[in-house]
């Protein structure tokens, strides 16, 4: 995907480049990836931009609020105000809007979410699950890094479920 396609509302790109992936974690960046630098409670993602660039990031999309000094490295830097709120839409675009190709059932509440999502995914054909125990086919789950995955991870998981031929995802 081209960076301009990913960020269709940004018209000040110096160069339009091909991108191979997205990452919020500088340690997970691979060559051709875009590093997404969000403002955190203790650190800004830009604090880790140089590490991401050293691993092959070709662009950095960052939240300008609290950004501080941008490292002087000759790659594409794109400031996006309200980036955290736009992350889901950006990730969905990158992964081809996977939820548009799936029936996604969200399960909320205090108790029983894991049981309900697992039973639902096991009972229905061509189903997957995203939840506390992991994501994927109910009998072959891939562990998640966090109990509640971030918007980027959710879109990646939904895209993988779609690519596996799943029609339904039960999500805690």
Region locations from a protein language model:
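N-terminal leader/targeting and accessory segments in enzymes
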Residues: 1-89
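Short beta-strand segments at enzyme active-site cores
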Residues: 60-63, 168-172
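Short, mixed-charge, low-aromatic patches
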Residues: 6-7, 44-49, 77, 110-119, ...
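Phosphate-binding loop of NTP-binding sites
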Residues: 86-171
């Amino acid at each position: 995907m081209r960076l301009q396609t990913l960020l269709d509302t940004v018209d000040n790109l110096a160069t339009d480049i091909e991108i191979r992936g997205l990452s919020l974690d500088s340690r997970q960046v691979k060559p051709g990836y875009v590093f997404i630098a969000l403002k955190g409670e203790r650190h800004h993602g830009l604090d880790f931009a140089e590490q991401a660039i050293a691993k092959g990031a070709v662009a950095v999309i960052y939240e300008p609020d609290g950004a501080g000094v941008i490292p002087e490295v000759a790659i594409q830097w794109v400031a996006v105000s309200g980036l955290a709120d736009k992350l889901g839409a950006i990730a969905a675009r990158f992964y081809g809007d996977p939820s548009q190709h799936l029936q996604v059932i969200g399960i909320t509440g205090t108790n029983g979410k894991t049981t309900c999502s697992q039973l639902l995914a096991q009972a229905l054909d061509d189903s997957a699950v995203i939840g506390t125990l992991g994501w994927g086919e109910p009998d072959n789950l891939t562990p998640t890094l966090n109990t509640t995955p971030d918007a980027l991870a959710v879109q990646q998981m939904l895209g993988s479920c779609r690519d596996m031929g799943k029609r339904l995802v039960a999500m805690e």
